[in-house]
Amino acid sequence: IDALGVIAYNLKKAMGEPFTIGVTGTNGKTSVTKLTAEILKQSFNVSTTIGNFNNDIGLPLSIFKAFNNETDKCVYELGASKKNDISQLVNICEPDMTTLLNVSEAHMQSFGNMENLISTKEEIFSHPRTNQVILNKDDLYYSKWARLNNDKKITTISAKENADYMIKYNNETDFYFTTVKGDFSIDKKYTTGHLPINMLFSVSLAMEAGANIEDVQNGLQSFKGVKGRFYKFISKNKSTVI
């Protein structure tokens, strides 16, 4: 397993070390990673996580399969089931920009307590190459994470207060985004099954990595979601299961 990480690390080095985004959190990792990659794919050659291969085996395999000489952006999901897992993964992919979506109780049997879980997720901020983080001002831990990253560029998002990137309901049919590159709206019909805050994370990550408003709009409209999540099933009696 260690050899996989070393090979993946050296492969990424050999390919010119393209701009890399690392995503972790208890919920939403896969959706945010996939949507961010979809937006960036509108203008860039992107390497991203295969499925939800987010551990010390899956991350190297994703790098092996998706990487090529033309890759200029990477978006990787980083998962953890025990202490130091995230540290190991950031040492493999060396992210330039990271985000910690949220922390809530999950896999507690392997962490022991909430403090261990939180500190493990915070390892996403630890790599010396990481010089920018995206933080949600609405999150309970925002102030703590801002203090941890006072030596980095902090880009903020919010659905409730002033931030670099904001989202709100424009009317019954649109979401309205305020961003550092301008404001725009998108029809809700293109966002079915996406949590607004996850869309905002993806928009901010992609735009900070170089995407423009047109890329965001096209990416949101073309994204088909994560397979097996938020799918609708209509039963014979017409009831709907999601």
Model-derived features: where do they sit?
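Acidic, Mg2+-coordinating active-site environments of NTP-dependent enzymes
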Residues: P18, M97-I242
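Short, basic phosphate-binding NTP loop
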Residues: I1-G22, S31-V32, A37-E38, Q42, ...
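Short beta-strand-centered segment that lines the nucleotide-binding/catalytic pocket of NTP-utilizing
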Residues: F44-G58, N102
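P-loop NTPase switch/communication element
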Residues: I57-T71
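Buried hydrophobic packing segments
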Residues: L4-A8, T36, L40, S62-I63, ...
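Conserved catalytic network of the ASCE P-loop NTPase/AAA+ motor domain
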Residues: K65-N69, N91-C93, S126-P128
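Switch II of P-loop NTPase G domains
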Residues: S81-I92
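Switch II (G3) loop of P-loop NTPases
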Residues: D72-K83, V241-I242
